[in-house]
C-alpha cells in the first residue's frame, strides 16, 4: 500500500490556529479599504472630541460641568425662592364651588389646619382625600400630589418594550390567536363589542408544562400593544407582615386604573392563588388574604376599566376555584408540547441569528426531539454553538446539532420534569 502524500495527511488532521497565526493574519490579511476605514474612524473620533470640548463636556470624577460655567449666585437665589413643601392630606372641603372655599388638611404627627389655596393652584385640582403639598409658614396648598404607591409596586411596571414579537413564538399559533382576541381586539377595536352589546373577556389563564412559551407569549403581547405592561411574580406578593400583600395588590390595581390601558401579568400565580384550606396553624392565612384581595379586584364592586389580566402557572390543579370562575378569568389557554411541525419551526426561529450551514435538516432534528419543549430546543441550539466554539469553527454544522441532541435530550432525560407536569395539566 503506497504511503499517503503529506498534503492529504494535513487535510485529514487540520491544525487549529494559534495566537501567532491569528496575529499574522491580522497583519498581512488586511483588505484594500482597511487604511481608509481606519482613517475615517480616526477623523470621527477627533470630531467627537472637538464637539465635546466646545460643549464644555469633560471627563470628570464628579460628572459636573466645568467650573467656569458655574453660576452660584442664581443657584442660591433659586434655592431661596423654592422652599421645600410638606406633605399633607386634604380631608374635607368647606364651601366647595365658591370663592371662599376652605380646605381641612391633616399634617401627619402635627395637627389639622383649615387653610386656603396658593396662587398657582386651581380649586378644581383639589379633591377630598388626595395628598397635597403645603408650605411650612401658612400651610397653604401649593401643589396637588399623586396618590401614594409603594415603590416596589411602581418597579413592577415594564418601562421598555420587550424585543420579542409573535414571530419569535413558535408552535403556538392557536394560543396566539386566543390571546390576541382577548387582549388586542378590545383595545384596538372596542366598537365591535359595543355593536354586539357584549363585554369583552377580561382575563386569561395560561397553563402548561415549564418551557412551553407562556411567559414568552406574554412578552410578545407587551411588545405588540401600546398599553402599560405590569409584570408581577407571585412570590413578590407574599410578605412578612399581615396585610402587606393585600395592600400591594390594591395599590397595583390602583396604579393600573390610572393608566389609559393596562395589562397586568401575574407570573407563577400558584404561589398566591392556591386553593384555601385550614392547616390548623394559620401559616397560609396571609397568602389566602392576598389571593382574596386579587379575587375582589378582578370582579369586585369597582369596575375594572380597560385592564386586562394575564396569569401563568404550571399547576392549574392547585388554583382556587373562585379565581378560575368566568368573569374573573374568562379564558383558559393550554400550552401543550409542540408537535413535529412546531418543533421544526422553533428550530428555525432559534437558528435564525446563528451562523449555520445551509443544508441542515431541521425536520430530522425535530424528529429526534420527541416530547421536548421549546426551552429544550433552545438549549439544543445553544449546545450546538458550544460544540462549534470548542472546535474553533465559525459555523455550526448538522453534526453539532446531532451531538447536542444526544447531550441535551438523551443525556438530561433524568432532569426533565415535563412528564410529571403533564399529569397536572
Curated annotation (Swiss-Prot):
SUPFAM superfamilies registered for this protein in UniProt: P-loop containing nucleoside triphosphate hydrolases (SSF52540)
Residues that coordinate or bind ATP: 208-215
Organism (species): Prunus persica
Pfam hit, one: AAA_lid_3
Keyword Nucleotide-binding included in the entry's annotation: yes
Family affiliation: Belongs to the AAA ATPase family.
Assigned GO CC terms: cytoplasm; nucleus; proteasome complex
Membrane-crossing residue ranges in chain numbering: none
Location within or outside the cell: Cytoplasm; Nucleus
Gene3D superfamilies (UniProt xref): 1.10.8.60, Nucleic acid-binding proteins, P-loop containing nucleotide triphosphate hydrolases
Lineage, uppermost ranks: Eukaryota, Viridiplantae, Streptophyta, Embryophyta, Tracheophyta
Full protein name: 26S proteasome regulatory subunit 7
UniProt GO MF annotations: ATP binding; ATP hydrolysis activity
Keywords recorded for this protein, A-Z: ATP-binding, Cytoplasm, Nucleotide-binding, Nucleus, Proteasome
Amino acid at each position: 500500500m503506497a504511503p499517503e502524500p503529506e498534503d492529504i495527511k494535513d487535510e485529514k488532521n487540520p491544525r487549529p490556529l494559534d495566537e501567532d497565526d491569528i496575529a499574522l493574519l491580522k497583519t498581512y490579511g488586511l483588505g484594500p479599504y482597511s487604511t481608509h476605514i481606519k482613517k475615517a474612524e480616526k477623523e470621527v473620533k477627533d470630531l467627537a472630541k472637538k464637539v465635546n470640548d466646545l460643549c464644555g463636556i469633560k471627563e470628570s470624577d464628579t460628572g459636573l460641568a466645568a467650573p467656569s460655567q458655574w453660576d452660584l449666585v442664581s443657584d442660591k437665589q433659586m434655592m431661596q425662592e423654592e422652599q421645600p413643601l410638606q406633605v399633607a392630606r386634604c380631608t374635607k372641603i368647606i364651601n366647595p364651588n365658591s370663592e371662599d372655599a376652605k380646605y381641612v388638611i391633616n399634617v401627619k404627627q402635627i395637627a389639622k389646619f383649615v387653610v386656603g389655596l396658593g396662587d398657582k393652584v386651581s380649586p378644581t385640582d383639589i379633591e377630598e382625600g388626595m395628598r397635597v403639598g403645603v408650605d411650612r409658614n401658612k400651610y397653604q396648598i401649593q401643589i396637588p400630589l399623586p396618590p401614594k404607591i409603594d415603590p416596589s409596586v411602581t418597579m413592577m411596571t415594564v418601562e421598555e418594550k420587550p424585543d420579542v414579537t409573535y414571530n419569535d413564538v413558535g408552535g403556538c399559533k392557536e394560543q396566539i390567536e386566543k390571546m390576541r382576541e382577548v387582549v388586542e381586539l378590545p383595545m384596538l377595536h372596542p366598537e365591535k363589542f359595543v355593536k354586539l352589546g357584549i363585554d369583552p373577556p377580561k382575563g386569561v389563564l395560561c397553563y402548561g408544562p415549564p418551557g412551553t412559551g407562556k411567559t414568552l407569549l406574554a412578552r410578545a403581547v407587551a411588545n405588540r400593544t401600546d398599553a402599560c405592561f405590569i409584570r408581577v411574580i407571585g412570590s413578590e406578593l407574599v410578605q412578612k407582615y399581615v396585610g402587606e400583600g393585600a395592600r400591594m395588590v390594591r395599590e397595583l390595581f390602583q396604579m393600573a386604573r390610572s393608566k389609559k390601558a393596562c395589562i397586568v401579568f401575574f407570573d407563577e400565580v400558584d404561589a398566591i392563588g392556591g386553593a384555601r384550606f385550614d392547616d390548623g396553624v394559620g401559616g397560609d392565612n396571609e397568602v389566602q388574604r392576598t389571593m382574596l384581595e386579587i379575587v375582589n379586584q378582578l370582579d369586585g364592586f369597582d369596575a375594572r376599566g380597560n385592564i386586562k389580566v394575564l396569569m401563568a402557572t404550571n399547576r392549574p390543579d392547585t388554583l382556587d376555584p373562585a379565581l378560575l370562575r368566568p368573569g374573573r378569568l374568562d379564558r383558559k389557554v393550554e400550552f401543550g408540547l409542540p408537535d413535529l411541525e412546531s418543533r421544526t419551526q422553533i428550530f428555525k426561529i432559534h437558528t435564525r441569528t446563528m451562523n449555520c450551514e445551509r443544508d441542515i435538516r431541521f425536520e430530522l432534528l425535530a424528529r429526534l426531539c420527541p416530547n421536548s419543549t421549546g426551552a429544550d430546543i433552545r438549549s439544543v441550539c445553544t449546545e450546538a454553538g458550544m460544540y462549534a466554539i470548542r472546535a474553533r469553527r465559525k459555523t455550526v454544522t448538522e453534526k453539532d446539532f446531532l451531538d447536542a441532541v444526544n447531550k441535551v435530550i438523551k443525556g438530561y432525560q433524568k432532569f426533565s420534569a415535563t412528564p410529571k407536569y403533564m399529569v397536572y395539566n
